[in-house]
Amino acid sequence: MEDDTKIGLDDAYSLKTPADNVALYRNWAETYDTEFARDRGYQYPQQIADIYSRYAGAHDVPVLDVGSGTGLVASTMREHHAIDSQLTIDGVDISPEMLEVSKKKNLYRQLFERDLSQSIELPKNHYGAVVSAGTFTHGHVGPEALAKLLPLCRSSALFIIGINGTAFDQYHFGSHLAALQADRQITPIEFVRVTYYASADDDNGADQGFAAIFRKASLYTPDP
């Protein structure tokens, strides 16, 4: 019998405000890795980490994991770079409870509780890469946050940004990314399709998205 009290995607996709996000993940944090990620075969974070491993060079550190949650992206990154002492990852998330779960895993150098819909108070010109899975989606973070991440990064920083497939069109991610490229803030964008789940058989089981891969332009000079 279906457990009607179990938190799921319908709850996550119906969120309206940052406060809604905080409330949902307060109640979901302790069971997220098992009742959601494990039971659904949630492979999206691993795919984002795999793409980072394929595209990143030695200079693409430290890494900022945006919407880091319980640390699923960082966990796979650590597996790929088990002997790489240079891999430094910071995490940022709106949920203190999710951050507390990830803190226990010892994956991150630092963890920051931040609302990405507001000004992002983090070190400027610091990061060599940004990764994200499950954050740019329905009820969570829109494309406006992308421009806010650029000042946090050094020139030529690598971005691996996962974006929900239907949210991509609904919230006009394509036009926002195109505007950043036209303004010479980012390099041309490559899109790689990602499949979210390996073992989910409900209405969202076949959900897909895109990983947007680009770099912060090395010589960004705004038009006069």
Predicted regions: what they are:
Residues 128-142:
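A short SAM/SAH-binding and catalytic strip from SAM-dependent methyltransferases
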Residues 200-224:
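Core SAM-dependent methyltransferase catalytic element
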Residues 1-31:
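N-terminal, positively charged/glycine-rich alpha-helical extensions of SAM-dependent methyltransferases
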Residues 64-120:
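Class I SAM-dependent methyltransferase SAM/SAH-binding core
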Residues 144-155:
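A short glycine-rich, Lys/Arg-flanked "PGG" loop and its adjoining helix->strand segment in the class I
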Residues 34-49:
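Conserved SAM-binding loop and adjacent beta-strand
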Residues 120-130:
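A short acidic, Gly/Pro-enriched loop at the edge of an enzyme's catalytic core
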Residues 160-185, 189:
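Conserved class I S-adenosyl-L-methionine
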